[in-house]
Amino acid sequence: MDKRHDPSRRIIAPTGTKLSCKSWLTEAPMRMLMNNLHPDVAERPEDLVVYGGIGRAARDWECYDKIVEVLQRLEDDETLLVQSGKPVGVFKTHSNAPRVIIANSNLVPHWANWEHFNELDKKGLAMYGQMTAGSWIYIGSQGIVQGTYETFVAMAKQHFGGSSKGKWILTGGLGGMGGAQPLAGTMAGYSVLTCEVDETRIDFRLRTRYVDKKATTLDEALAMIDEANASGKPVSVGLLANAADVFAELVERGITPDVVTDQTSAHDPLNGYLPQGWTLEQAAQMRKTDEAAVVKAAKQSMAVQVKAMLALQAAGSATTDYGNNIRQMAFEEGVENAFDFPGFVPAYVRPLFCEGIGPFRWAALSGDPEDIYKTDAKVKELIPDNPHLHNWLDMARERIAFQGLPSRICWVGLKDRARLALAFNEMVNNGELSAPVVIGRDHLDSGSVASPNRETESMLDGSDAVSDWPLMNALLNTASGATWVSLHHGGGVGMGFSQHSGVVIVADGTDDAAARLGRVLWNDPATGVMRHADAGYDIAKDCAKEQGLDLPMLEK
């Protein structure tokens, strides 16, 4: 019997102001853990899988129950340690220490590969935490919508003279991360064709308004795209098909999309990518009987897809890797020029990282959408001169369906995170908000990740693989008083290819919270500016000087 599987479980986080724990500092991690497993949030909540192949919130159901039990009894001078989804210890600390410290799927580098991890996973000794699955701050597909939107807007500026009118995107994957692409694309003015092998995922994205239409043949999907481009009204289409088949077929037909990318779970060839010609049922069975054959077949199909992406790039498509390590998988299968198209971070996002700008997010523990709308208004009030940001907030309110607890993603940087957080804390204090909010971010941020095939690809000084930075980020956030801090391995791109840290802090309206918020939400993005300044980026050096960062080796 698999201790991770229980179809009878239906987890819904409590809402309102009644506490199940001894304070908001422990109530918040409990609610956010539960929210990660909400049926509208998680991909396979009955298996504790939140997103990204096998990204879990807890190691098994026994561990989940024990985490909740401990959080409900935890005092405000105690810290719970969670090791790969298992609560292993409670220790006396102090009131400004984190209430929870999490480490997920970390392996000594020589053994940091899927084969070793999968053996540990089978024995119940490890858990893959992805990025925000095991750190309890996943907010559904909204969590990546704005970053994807910003990337697509940047692509329009770089490749199409600033206009996406009549342009269309080809991509793959409608899981927890990939599901953001169709909505982000149409928000940015493109039509989007997304290939997905699991019809239930297409239906889920239709229900939550991330996808506009479903197609079962390529001809049907292309007709929908053509009609939308002719009418000037962008459309997103979920096509029930294997991405490798479709990408290769478009090359064969001589059809060239304007933008090509992919967000299948290629980072995990065993669990995340369906080989060409296989059914979902066949793959599920083969994973039990012949893992090596599944991995081999999946990587061969990825090689087909990447070859097609390279061919489409040569035909004129703006082509980018959206951070799932598909280029690496294809390279290992003999596609020697797999890295001829760039990753999205060095191509489009790094200038933002240089100013500490990244995926700042918050969730309303009240469960009341009005609390989010009030914070949206506060962001506009405090950042009045950023029409692009205002436009994002307006579109998000109009077009993004909340999944689980109401939440918002908003890319802001060093200059703004702490002051927004302090304003939210004051809104809790004066009763404008009906309950506290939690403030966190993705691990995909400027100072919190080392990932040579994604966030730290092609660093100016060649320091792509140096992972001191996310370790220092986690330690500094712990010292600064975050409510929970996490340190993970393998998120986004798979085992052996990344290390990264997460941070979440509660704004409960108290003066103590204000002090912690001021420290954490200044120091956290400041580490991103520091990391990029150290690598030699002028934008980061200028930002560090403007903001008065004390970086001893930076020339004054």
Curated annotation (Swiss-Prot):
- Required co-factors: NAD(+)
Pathway per its UniProt entry is: Amino-acid degradation; L-histidine degradation into L-glutamate; N-formimidoyl-L-glutamate from L-histidine: step 2/3
- Co-factor note (free text): Binds 1 NAD(+) per subunit.
Q: Which organism is it from?
A: Shewanella piezotolerans (strain WP3 / JCM 13877)
Q: Which residues form the active site?
A: 410
Chain positions recorded as NAD(+) binding sites? 52-53, 130, 176-178, 196, 201, 242-243, 263-267, 273-274, 322, 492
Q: Which residues form a coiled coil?
A: none
The molecule here is called Urocanate hydratase
Q: Give a Gene Ontology cellular component term annotated to this protein.
A: cytoplasm
Alphabetically ordered keywords of this record: Cytoplasm, Histidine metabolism, Lyase, NAD
Q: In the record, what terms sit under GO molecular function?
A: urocanate hydratase activity
Give the reaction(s) catalysed. 4-imidazolone-5-propanoate = trans-urocanate + H2O
